[in-house]
Amino acid sequence: MAIKKRNKIRLPSGSPEEVGIDGSAHKPMQQIKPLVSNDSEDDDNDICVLQPIKFKKVPKRDITFDGEQAIKEDNSHYEDLYHSKKNTNASTRNKDDLLILNMEDLMEGNHHLLSDSSEAGSSSEGEHISSIPTRGEIAKLKAQKSLSRRKISESDVTTERDYVKLLDSEDKREIMETIRLNGGLKRNNEKEITNFSDDEMQGFQDEMLALTDNQIAIQKDSKRKIIEKAINEVPYRTNEEWETQLLSKGNINKSNEKIITPLPVLFPDDDESGNSIERINEMVSKICLQRKKVEMRLQALEKTKIDLEKSKASLINKLIGN
């Protein structure tokens, strides 16, 4: 890095008044000569070379408080956690020391391989081989398996529990997923539907979704007609004779119910004239009383009919709303 000097500008030494009197301000300014030379030798001498920074190692100081002594940490217990390279090299085994055993070979009389390998191996290898089952243990395991197979064969019926015991967690998860997609588990109170054809399902298909107000009104009217048709088809009006008999009493059911037939003129005798009039009056009063009773019953029936029609309309509206 070359450092160059700046050019200095020399100002006139005289006062500004003298400069104005002498008229030096009107003189042309001379060019200022540079004071620094452009020689390459001077530039090389002016280059400053930065020295590398060096840091000194300072020992770590242990900070101790008043009345306390510095305690050195014992890191010996960490050595047990990490094995050295010497220990790892000693623990490694050669590929020739490994021995592959077959259960059938052991049963056929090749058990002498175990003894040879145990004699040739180290103490650690001997511990590993000692965990291999003996001939008696192998025979015992085979006997237990044969007993379990015999129990299954005696039943001749494989239950779902026996099948599930052979499955792992992934198979069980897949089975539960397929059950969930097919409608879930079947309850005991559900009825079994067999031979259910597609033609029978046509009545249960969903209708087109009504989006506009006009479509909603048309759908409600169609539902109302279907419900009213189903209600009218119910044969609950089987015993209507009592109603006709009730209306026929007192000439209420006839067209000329307000017209009373005139009675014939009787020629009363001297003795029986009073008794006959009283009988006629009693009969007329009984008929009028009976007629009033029938009219009251008819009014009550009409009132109940109106209430039933109102409840029917409200029930239809609820069914359409749902």
Swiss-Prot record:
<dbReference type="GO" id="GO:0000390">
    <property type="term" value="P:spliceosomal complex disassembly"/>
</dbReference>
<keyword id="KW-0539">Nucleus</keyword>
<keyword id="KW-0963">Cytoplasm</keyword>
<comment type="subunit">
    <text>Component of the NTR complex (NTC-related complex), composed of NTR1, NTR2 and PRP43. Interacts with CLF1, NTR1 and PRP43.</text>
</comment>
<comment type="function">
    <text>Involved in pre-mRNA splicing and spliceosome disassembly. Promotes release of excised lariat intron from the spliceosome by acting as a receptor for PRP43. This targeting of PRP43 leads to disassembly of the spliceosome with the separation of the U2, U5, U6 snRNPs and the NTC complex.</text>
</comment>
<keyword id="KW-0597">Phosphoprotein</keyword>
<dbReference type="GO" id="GO:0005681">
    <property type="term" value="C:spliceosomal complex"/>
</dbReference>
<keyword id="KW-0507">mRNA processing</keyword>
<feature type="modified residue" description="Phosphoserine">
    <location>
        <position position="153"/>
    </location>
</feature>
<feature type="region of interest" description="Disordered">
    <location>
        <begin position="113"/>
        <end position="137"/>
    </location>
</feature>
<dbReference type="GO" id="GO:0005783">
    <property type="term" value="C:endoplasmic reticulum"/>
</dbReference>
<feature type="region of interest" description="Disordered">
    <location>
        <begin position="1"/>
        <end position="30"/>
    </location>
</feature>
<keyword id="KW-0508">mRNA splicing</keyword>
<feature type="compositionally biased region" description="Low complexity">
    <location>
        <begin position="115"/>
        <end position="132"/>
    </location>
</feature>
<protein>
    <recommendedName>
        <fullName>Pre-mRNA-splicing factor NTR2</fullName>
    </recommendedName>
</protein>
<dbReference type="GO" id="GO:0005634">
    <property type="term" value="C:nucleus"/>
</dbReference>
<dbReference type="Pfam" id="PF15458">
    <property type="entry name" value="NTR2"/>
</dbReference>
<feature type="modified residue" description="Phosphoserine">
    <location>
        <position position="197"/>
    </location>
</feature>
<dbReference type="GO" id="GO:0005737">
    <property type="term" value="C:cytoplasm"/>
</dbReference>
<dbReference type="InterPro" id="IPR028211">
    <property type="entry name" value="Ntr2"/>
</dbReference>
<feature type="modified residue" description="Phosphoserine">
    <location>
        <position position="40"/>
    </location>
</feature>
<dbReference type="GO" id="GO:0071008">
    <property type="term" value="C:U2-type post-mRNA release spliceosomal complex"/>
</dbReference>
<keyword id="KW-0747">Spliceosome</keyword>
